[in-house]
């Protein structure tokens, strides 16, 4: 047989699903990989049989019940996505909450969260700036990037952004599409307030004497938007 990578993956899924079927037939409760493999394989077979995407989305959520799996497994599987070849092309079947009907109960290892909203950077001053993307491509800025040094194609008050970062959750980012103009909230960088790398406009202590003025001059000389 000459098999593609995708075909080998499907055979691996089939093997795992067959193991899950045998264990289920013996009365064993399925773990996470077994449950995912079984549902995925059944959806793939449904695709092979010529069933429609809408039908398979419902079918995929009726294959297993909470009684078929170990405690906590339904809560681990929020969705399963299966790509398959239909008569009219390749499509993605997404099964949301594939193991439904789990009773509301505490699950081992889960987090019990208090209600309400978390305020980002509580008590820290917030500066709002209007930013325009004058570049011909999208620009994405991460949460802790020194905003003063972001892509030169973004136009805003650079001086006001010196020593600030985006007021968004750590690890997230804001994307600016070409020609887009939007407001962003900034908060002061914390910690030791030392910045290295980026666009090499600071490379040191943000608050050291003369650093801000030198960084602004460097931004102007390099043509950074809004530094003039």
From Swiss-Prot:
Its main location: cytoplasm. It catalyses: urea + 2 H2O + H(+) = hydrogencarbonate + 2 NH4(+). It is found in: Cytoplasm. Pathway: Nitrogen metabolism; urea degradation; CO(2) and NH(3) from urea (urease route): step 1/1. GO terms for biological process: urea catabolic process. The keyword Manganese does not apply. PANTHER family: UREASE. In the N-terminal section; belongs to the urease gamma subunit family. This is Urease subunit gamma/beta. It comes from Deinococcus radiodurans (strain ATCC 13939 / DSM 20539 / JCM 16871 / CCUG 27074 / LMG 4051 / NBRC 15346 / NCIMB 9279 / VKM B-1422 / R1).
